[in-house]
């Protein structure tokens, strides 16, 4: 059973530069920062409602995250689900023939963690984590609303996440999209043709506790954006490669 989206990982060139946007402009509280030597990163977790945002700075160009940065630039890297027993989850998935990168959990910034191979989840790199300590939800001006995933076969991709992790489908008004509930957040699987042909993680959506205060902060900082009545879209150049939507409302 997956309890929630624990975090979404974002590769950045420098943590200090990313803090200037995610912590100082958006107001996401910094929970912890540490060097994770076996992953070749310096990482930080910031609170976003029941979920978190993980920023990943490579320690060198030859590390996996360093190669990702050189190949793709800054942007979305992985998706992490919280499970009550990461060892049991990895064992179960491995026994079912699911490709995994870790058959046993190891230490990570999120607790005891393990990764599945991207081929297991339609090209999305998925991490499973069991936090080593229970933390209450940190107050934050933004809550993670959903992660958007592009797919050439929406039904198949949604079915994989349902089969592997037991997520339930959220009813939508027809169409070719599929939405899955994960804790209080959602995954939205959309046709790749609707998102520039991108297959994999495409965009993050947050809901603001005080939408007017948030838009004022973006305006003061001179952040390039598209303002709407109930949503603001931040240009990826300002949000370290992430298509970022911030809404006034939790639904739809």
Feature roles, as predicted:
Residues 172-215:
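Intrinsically disordered, low-complexity segments enriched in Gly and acidic/Ser/Thr residues
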Residues 90-143, 179-182, 186-188, 215-252:
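Vicinal oxygen chelate
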Residues 140-189:
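A mid-sequence, solvent-exposed acidic-amphipathic segment
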Residues 18-23, 93, 157-162, 218:
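Conserved active-site tyrosine of GNAT-family acetyltransferases
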Residues 1-9, 15-47, 54-57:
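An N-terminus-focused feature that recognizes amino-terminal "leader" regions
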Residues 1-19, 76-83, 129-158, 201-204, ...:
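N-terminal beta-strand motif that seeds the catalytic metal site of vicinal oxygen chelate
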Residues 54-58, 80-84, 92, 96, ...:
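A structural feature that tracks compact, well-ordered secondary-structure segments
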Residues 45-50, 62-79, 87-110, 117-120:
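Active-site-adjacent scaffolding segments
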């Amino acid at each position: 059973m997956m309890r929630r989206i624990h975090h979404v990982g974002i590769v950045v060139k420098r943590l200090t530069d990313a803090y200037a946007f995610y912590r100082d402009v958006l107001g996401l509280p910094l929970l912890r920062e540490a060097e994770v030597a076996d992953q070749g990163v310096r990482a930080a977790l910031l609170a976003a409602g029941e979920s978190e945002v993980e920023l990943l700075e490579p320690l060198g160009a030859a590390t996996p995250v360093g190669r990702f940065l050189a190949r793709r630039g800054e942007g979305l890297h992985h998706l992490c689900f919280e499970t009550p027993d990461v060892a049991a989850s990895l064992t179960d998935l491995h026994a079912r023939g699911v490709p995994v990168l870790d058959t046993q959990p190891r230490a990570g910034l999120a607790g005891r963690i393990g990764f599945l191979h991207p081929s297991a989840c339609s090209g999305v790199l998925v991490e499973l984590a069991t936090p080593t300590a229970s933390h209450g939800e940190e107050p934050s001006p933004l809550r993670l609303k959903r992660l958007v995933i592009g797919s050439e076969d929406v039904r198949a991709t949604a079915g994989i996440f349902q089969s592997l992790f037991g997520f339930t489908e959220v009813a939508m008004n027809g169409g070719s999209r599929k939405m899955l509930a994960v804790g209080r957040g959602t995954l939205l699987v959309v046709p790749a043709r609707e998102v520039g042909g991108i297959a994999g993680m495409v965009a993050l959506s947050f809901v603001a506790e005080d939408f007017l205060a948030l838009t004022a902060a973006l305006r003061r900082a001179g952040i390039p954006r598209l303002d709407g009545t109930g949503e603001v879209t931040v240009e990826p150049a300002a949000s370290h490669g992430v298509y970022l939507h911030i809404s006034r409302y939790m639904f739809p």
